[in-house]
């Protein structure tokens, strides 16, 4: 693979390589994704996003969204695996579409494997309606508040709560005796029972009313500086533990890469707001030259 155009961007330092494919001819292989995402031998990123017309997507369920969204966010994790979507990535994707004139106006839809995502420009940058954040409130969770056990490397076993934001998450709130910065996330935390599709794991420290800090280990990537859907999952779980009502709809989520805002809407969806920055354009030659 030679002469591949790309754009590099990030949302709160969760970084991505965007690959435009306006004719739908280059379905990236796992090896190509891993090579592009490699921080030493490639461009470097937490994920790779192919920018392709929705009508040319391989998946019929995605193509069905073409009447409402012109562009499909074909998201891949850094290890080459296919993912449903990425919250921070949707903002970077939106910034790219607007810069290139592929979308116009302050509000439009993006097609993803997790369904349509509505984007609008706001003072912070971009706000994306990610749909419902579904807390797994099955019987065990209703009784104890938890339905998983999470063990970070070298740390104690901690209770966790599963949340679905179009992709899987397990949220852990830290006890006062454990500092967020002390966690070793250099290896994937052990989660039991382990979901068959894997899970992102968010560790949360409560800073105040409607204000949390978070670190995340993303499936297929490792620890990242930010995770948009993870911020939504963390806010949704903390809100559920608090008792969700009209007084705790807006949450500030501090991540190592910056700050995000999560708002739970009247429609029962979660809106994620934050910055998106495009930092470079180039041609990747796969080491040639």
Predicted features, each with a name:
Residues 1-123, 170-289:
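A glycine-rich beta-to-alpha transition motif near the start of alpha/beta enzyme domains, typified by
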Residues 47, 131, 160-162, 282:
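Glycine-centered structural positions embedded in regular secondary structure
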Residues 83, 131-133:
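Flexible, glycine/proline-enriched loop segments at strand-loop-helix junctions
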Residues 124-131:
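Short, solvent-exposed secondary-structure boundary/capping segments
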Residues 136, 142-146, 150-155, 163, ...:
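C-terminal domain-closing interface element
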Residues 141-147, 192-197:
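Short, conserved active-site entrance elements at the starts or edges of catalytic domains
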Residues 147-181:
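Internal active-site segments that recognize and position negatively charged phosphoryl groups
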């Amino acid at each position: 693979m030679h002469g591949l155009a790309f754009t590099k961007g990030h949302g709160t330092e969760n970084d991505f390589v965007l690959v435009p494919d306006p004719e739908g001819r280059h379905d990236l292989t796992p090896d190509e994704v891993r090579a592009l995402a490699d921080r030493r031998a490639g461009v470097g990123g937490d994920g790779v996003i192919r920018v392709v017309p929705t009508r040319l997507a391989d998946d019929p369920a995605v193509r069905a969204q073409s009447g409402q969204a012109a562009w499909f966010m074909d998201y891949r994790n850094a290890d080459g695996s296919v993912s449903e979507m990425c919250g921070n990535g949707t903002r970077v994707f939106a910034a790219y579409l607007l810069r290139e004139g592929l979308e116009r106006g302050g509000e439009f839809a993006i097609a993803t494997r997790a369904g349509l995502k509505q984007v609008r420009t706001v003072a912070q940058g971009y706000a994306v309606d990610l749909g419902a954040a579904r807390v797994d409130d099955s019987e065990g969770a209703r009784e104890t508040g938890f339905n998983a056990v999470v063990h970070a490397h070298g740390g104690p076993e901690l209770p966790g709560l599963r949340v679905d934001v179009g992709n899987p998450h397990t949220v852990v709130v830290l006890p006062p005796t454990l500092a967020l910065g002390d966690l070793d996330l250099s290896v994937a935390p052990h989660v039991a029972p382990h979901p068959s599709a894997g899970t992102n794991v968010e560790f949360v420290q409560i800073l105040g009313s409607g204000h949390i800090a978070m670190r995340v280990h993303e499936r297929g990537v490792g620890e990242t500086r930010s995770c948009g859907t993870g911020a939504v999952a963390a806010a949704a779980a903390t809100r559920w533990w608090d008792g969700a009502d009209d007084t705790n709809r807006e949450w500030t989520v501090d991540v190592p890469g910056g700050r995000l805002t999560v708002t739970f809407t009247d429609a029962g969806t979660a809106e994620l707001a934050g910055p998106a920055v495009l930092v470079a354009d180039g041609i990747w030659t796969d080491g040639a030259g």
